[in-house]
Amino acid sequence: MSLHPDLEAFLDLAQDSQDAGLPAMHQLTPSEARATFEQTTAQLRWPAPQDLEVSEIETLTRDGAALALRLYRPNGIESPLPVLVYFHGGGFVVGSLDSHDGVCREFCQRTPCAVLSVGYRLAPEHRFPTALEDGEDALAWLAEQAASLGLDGSRVAFGGDSAGATLATVLAIQAVRWPHTVAIAPKVQLLCYPVTDASRVHDSRLLFGEGYLLENDTLEWFYQHYARGPEDYLDWRFSPLLAEDLRGVAPAIVLLAGFDPLLDEGQAYVDRLRGQGVEVEVEVCAGLTHDLLRLGAVVPGVLEVYSRVGGALARALEIG
């Protein structure tokens, strides 16, 4: 297995920048890291679909804070529309509706379905489990508003990438284990290179923890900002691989990257789900790294991944 040549050249440039003294994310303050992440997003932007209806929405969390949502709708598709509720990646510390705008546009167009992107609050200002509670509140809003917006509350997927995939799968588990906390039960979960186990270092973190976009030191920096204390690492809502009972959770579409420090824990989660009778469709993008969905400008073949994953989502949501 070898890196995609376009991605290898991109990683070489990133390494040159660090060698020249540009600080790594874990050497920044959270506010500096967020600004850098958004700047990088602008540099990585690709021509994602624009022929969509996009609405900015604001609702309130249970504690009265503003919760930003963004609703994407494909044109020319009859209502009621199935919905992908999407949680962006960024280690619970960085990322935003804007940083993953292109990701949501691709899934909206290529599935096609409505996409509700959730601007959950970030750590360390809002530590675990605030992001999950914001996710619960977003789902409560969707349950109340779906019919009036022409959305089908019976055909909903929970999805996300990296830390966002963690939120998506934990909410999918809660829908079965703690149904009183989740207003809508998903038909399927879309988990793109998820964080599933902060409690230990898996082998892929040793193999790919330096020089492959996501660094081990950055991972630990994320966890330390998100957790209230070390005991949170053992909470299944922080590390869903540690969940005792996964029986009955929604079928999963799982996307992994071959050069990702999170590869092994992602595969371990696939194995756990299958071992407890959950249907799982998995794709490993062999020559790619973590955050591959935002690399369409670097590796054009990433857009084909969206088509394959969108097709799987369409089947699961009974589209077409």
Where are these regions (language model features)?
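Short beta-strand-to-loop junctions in surface cap/lid or active-site-entrance loops
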Residues: 69-80, 241-246
